[in-house]
Amino acid sequence: MDYTNVYGVLHKTNFIIIMILIDGKKIAAELREELKKEVLNLKSKHNKIPGLTVILIGDMVPSQIYVRMKEKAANEVGLKSEVIRYPDSVEEKTVLDKIDELNKDESVSGILVQLPLPKHIDKQKVIEAISPGKDVDGFHPVNVGNLSSGYESTVPCTPLGCYLLIKKFEKNLSGKKAIIVGRSNLNGKP
């Protein structure tokens, strides 16, 4: 197969691929600035600052890095941010009780339980314990069902991020086709 690169366009018999270099860091910085303004607006109009609480169980380095990045981004845009850390040995009931407490706490706008969880903790039970309105990941069955049915819902971060990136370059997505590789609950469904 012989492809020719001409001004960012690859030509091959019967199809054309257009390539666009996307500066994700720049777009993320722009989005953070927009969010910062929204947070300030909420504070001035309603005297309320949204709050994100993340539950991190165990000491897996990738999870710690990911949570640290979330905490940094939340602080950058002016959100209240809290990370609750538990050891791998934490009992499931302790986690469920904490989620129940956070669901009732009006200063907490969003709850995120960092996955994966230790084997002795039922992931589905933990996900279902989070109030659908505070489910940051969009994993609660109510949110998954609403999203699958085309109703307003929390959208998982990765697909939403991809959508926002695409919208920066292509304003009208009507009639467009997309390929999603993978079928995980986080990225590939629904």
Where are these regions (language model features)?
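Anion-binding alpha/beta catalytic cores of soluble intermediary-metabolism enzymes, centered on
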Residues: 113-178
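Short beta-strand segments enriched in small/hydrophobic residues
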Residues: 49-59
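Glycine-rich phosphate/diphosphate-binding loop of Rossmann-like nucleotide-binding domains
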Residues: 57-71, 153-190
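Short beta-strand elements in bilobed, periplasmic/extracellular small-molecule ligand-binding domains
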Residues: 52, 74-89
